[in-house]
A protein has these predicted regions:
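Substrate-binding/charge-relay-adjacent region of secreted/lumenal peptidase catalytic domains
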Residues: 1-188
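Short acidic, Gly/Pro-enriched loop/turn segments at secondary-structure junctions
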Residues: 193-196
Length: 196
């Protein structure tokens, strides 16, 4: 979906961000971010071509993206957050650490961002309970500092991936960290073509 369509659909036509509304993308799972791809996307979307202000943890490389799946998630996240809020300084932070460790590291920075978007997740039942508790504690610490956390409900929502091929195998298996009470859980947007 084009950024302008999202702006119109959610009535965000005037939202452009500002220098004080910092934002961060959580990168993981061996996904690469391509600054050149971001610039191309911004130009395509008629958005100001503004680079990320900070790249932490590596996994930033234009040449790795010759295979789409190497960069799909990281590029999508950076493209849309920076097009929807182009004047907000944006950081890409890559780590293979658990979500709670990532939040600890961010909370220990001099000035945590105002918004963190995490489109990665893991089935809640497969994670150690200690990770949930530690994540919640770190999320509260960031919240006190003024940071809002957004987390994806995953590609399958709570139905789990078994339902992809067989709807009768639907199960209740939500994705963490969107199940934390200290994040805003974000589901998918499906819009019928006739609306536009």
């Amino acid at each position: 979906m084009e950024p302008d369509s999202l702006r119109s659909y959610y009535n965000m036509t005037g939202a452009k961000g500002s220098i004080n509304s910092t934002q961060m993308i959580f990168g993981s799972s061996n996904q690469w971010f391509s600054p050149a791809n971001l610039a191309s996307f911004q130009a395509w979307a008629y958005s100001p071509v503004i680079p990320a202000v900070a790249l932490i943890g590596g996994h930033v490389n234009d040449t790795k993206c010759y295979i789409h799946s190497f960069c799909a998630e990281a590029n999508l996240d950076m493209q849309y957050i920076m097009t929807m809020s182009p004047y907000s300084p944006t950081t890409f932070w890559y780590t293979d650490a658990w979500f709670n460790i990532f939040l600890q590291e961010v909370a220990n920075t001099a000035k945590p961002p105002k918004v963190i978007s995490m489109s990665y997740g893991a089935y809640e039942t497969g994670m150690p309970a200690g990770v949930h508790t530690s994540f919640d504690i770190e999320a509260v610490k960031l919240g006190i500092q003024g940071t809002t956390l957004f987390a994806s409900s995953g590609d399958d929502g709570v139905s789990a991936f078994f339902a992809r091929s067989d709807g009768s195998k639907c199960a209740y298996d939500p994705v963490f960290p969107c199940t934390s009470p200290y994040v805003i859980a974000v589901g998918g947007t499906i819009v019928s073509l006739w609306i536009f």
